[in-house]
Amino acid sequence: YCIELTSNIKKRCLVFNLCTNEIGSLVGYIGFLNAKIVPVMLKADLDEILLTNMIETYKPAYLHLPSILADRFDKFEKVYSNIGYTLLKTNFTEEFELNEDLALLLTTSGSTGSPKLVRQSYKNIEANTKSIVEYLQLNETERAITTLPMNYTYGISIINTHLWVGASIILTEKGLMQKEFWQQMKNFEATSFAGVPY
């Protein structure tokens, strides 16, 4: 999927990855980083007006989103679809030169109205990942369950660290207060979950 997806995209362009804690979103993220394509990690259920404004402001070359949302963007060309996610080519023709070190863009926490984006370089991601792995002594026996969205810095760092050590990631859209979440914890033998105070 990664190779098929990214073969449809020019290197060093901007892609809005509308995130869910599902395999299509995760594989897109991994594929984009490996192919030197810069994802902007946004929540899939972002307010439609806010998303439209961000698209007009940042002019991404592509949108990678849950297939069930693709019809909302019928003015964009459907390029690829698989495992519940669709890649759409936008109609922005102007190309922007992106810094070679830029790996991804994340929104700041608490952004309202018009999210601000934080730049992450490949070196930042690697250094942060190695530091967390070392501090927490993570290894391939770990089985983290996604309790935080992957468009959050904390959520994506859990994914990065566990992939780094060859550990397992249990993807779920269920929340801590849902019975199904705890059933998945048990069924898939999760060893950890992360959270932030409310």
Regions found by a protein language model. Name each.
Residues 126-143, 153-194:
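Conserved AMP-binding/adenylation subdomain of ANL enzymes
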Residues 103-130:
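Conserved AMP-binding A3 loop
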Residues 3-45, 147-149:
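Conserved AMP-binding/adenylate-forming
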